[in-house]
Amino acid sequence: MSRLQFQLQTTDGHARRGRLTFPRGTVETPAFMPVGTYGSVKGILPEQIRALGAEIILGNTFHLYLRPGLDVIGDHGGLHGFARWDGPILTDSGGFQVFSLAHRRKITEQGVTFSSPTDGARVFLGPEESMQIQKVLDSDIVMIFDECTPYPATEDVARRSMELSLRWAQRSRQAHDGLGNDAALFGIVQGGVHPDLRSRSLDGLQAIGFDGYAIGGLAVGEPEHERNAMLEHLHPRLPAERPRYLMGVGRPEDLVEGVARGVDMFDCVMPTRNARNGHYFTSFGTVRIRNAKYERDLDTIEPGCGCHACSSGYTRAYLRHLDRCNEMLAPMLGTLHNLWYYEKLMADMRAAIAAGTFVEFRRSFYAARGATTPPLPGESS
C-alpha cells in the first residue's frame, strides 16, 4: 500500500482543491514544486524553501544517479538526509533528461543506452534501473520510466512512442512492487497532441493502476492552445480520486490555466532559472531588471510583496547593480522573490477554489496584467 493519501476537498468548475498526505508531511493542492535538480534548489537553503510556502520539492533521478551516485546518497539514508529536506520529495524517472540531454542515445525495448553528459561514459537506463535508483533515493513520489514524445511528431511516431511508454509503465509497476517500495508511483500519460493517443495511454495506465497520473510531453514546445486542448480532453477521463500532475509547466499563466483545467501539481525550473537571468515575476507581469529604466528605481520588485527581497527593502536599482556586477546576491534574492510569488499564487488559487470564487480570481489575475481573460471551453470570448 502506498504511503500517499489524497483527499479531494472541493471543486470550483474544473479547478480542484485537495490535500496530499505523507508520513513526512502534507501538501495542499494545487501545489507548485520547486525543482532541486542536483539535490538543492539553486541559491537558497532548505529552511528558506519551507518559509516560502513550499511543502514538496522535486529531485532529478538522472543527474543524481550520474553524480554523486547512489553510494554517496545511500550513505546518507536517501535524498532527504543528503539534501537536509525533511518534507516530501518527488523524483522524476530520468526519462525526460535521457531524451533531452543525453548524447548518442540508443532506444531499444529494454531501455536507453546513452553517453553520460558528465564524463562520456556509456550508461544504460531502463524501467527497472529507474525504479531501483528511486528506491535508493527514498522519494515519496516515484515517476515511471517513459519516453517523452517530441514535438512536433507525426501521429505514427507519437503512437509508437506512447505504446513503448505503456510497456515500460507495466515494467516500472512490477519493478517498483518487487522492490517492496511503499512510495507512491505515478503513471505518465503520453501521446503528443493527439487526443485518441492520450486516451489510449490513460486507459492503459489505469488498467495497470497507479497512485497518481502525470501528464507528460506538454512542455516540449507545443503551442499553448494545443496543451490546453489536451488538458481539456483528459480532465473528464482522469480518475477524480487520484492526483494529477502536469510535468514541466511553467509560466504563471500556465499554472492558472492548468488549475482551471483540473491539474493538482506542477513543477518548473522557470522561477529559479529566470531569477538567475534577472527576470522577476510579479502580479502585473515580469520585471526584467537588466532594463536601463531600473537604474535609479527605488521601488522593490513588487511593492507590498512579502518575500525577503521586497520586505527587506532591496530596490530594483540595487538588484540591477548586483546583476550587472555578477554578484551572487542578485540571483539569491531573485530566487527568493520568484518562488515566493509562485507559492503565493498557488495559495491564492487554493483559497479562491475553497471560496467558490476561482472564476473571479482568474479574471483579476489577467486584469492585473492588462490582459484579457482567455475563454474556457463553453464560454464566449
Curated annotation (Swiss-Prot):
Q: Which residues bind substrate?
A: D92, S93, G94, G95, F96, D146, Q190, G217
Signal sequence interval, chain numbering:
none
Q: Which NCBIfam families match?
A: Q_tRNA_tgt, tgt_general
The GO annotation for biological process reads: queuosine biosynthetic process; tRNA wobble guanine modification; tRNA-guanine transglycosylation
- Give the note describing cofactor binding and stoichiometry: Binds 1 zinc ion per subunit.
Identify the pathway.
Answer: tRNA modification; tRNA-queuosine biosynthesis
Residue segments, region RNA binding: 248-254, 272-276
Its family remark reads:
Belongs to the queuine tRNA-ribosyltransferase family.
Q: Write out the catalytic residues in the record.
A: D92 (proton acceptor), D267 (nucleophile)
UniProt keyword Metal-binding present: yes
Oligomeric state and interaction partners are given as: Homodimer. Within each dimer, one monomer is responsible for RNA recognition and catalysis, while the other monomer binds to the replacement base PreQ1.
Q: What InterPro entries would the database entry show?
A: ArchSynthase1/Queuine_TRR, TGT, TGT-like_sf, tRNA_ribo_trans-like
Cofactor annotation: Zn(2+)
The record, for HAMAP family, names: Q_tRNA_Tgt
Name listed for the protein in its UniProt record: Queuine tRNA-ribosyltransferase
Q: What does this protein do?
A: Catalyzes the base-exchange of a guanine (G) residue with the queuine precursor 7-aminomethyl-7-deazaguanine (PreQ1) at position 34 (anticodon wobble position) in tRNAs with GU(N) anticodons (tRNA-Asp, -Asn, -His and -Tyr). Catalysis occurs through a double-displacement mechanism. The nucleophile active site attacks the C1' of nucleotide 34 to detach the guanine base from the RNA, forming a covalent enzyme-RNA intermediate. The proton acceptor active site deprotonates the incoming PreQ1, allowing a nucleophilic attack on the C1' of the ribose to form the product.
Q: Which UniProt keywords apply?
A: Glycosyltransferase, Metal-binding, Queuosine biosynthesis, Transferase, tRNA processing, Zinc
GO CC, sorted alphabetically, is:
cytosol
EC assignment: the record states 2.4.2.29
User: Which superkingdom heads the taxonomic lineage of this protein's source?
Assistant: Bacteria
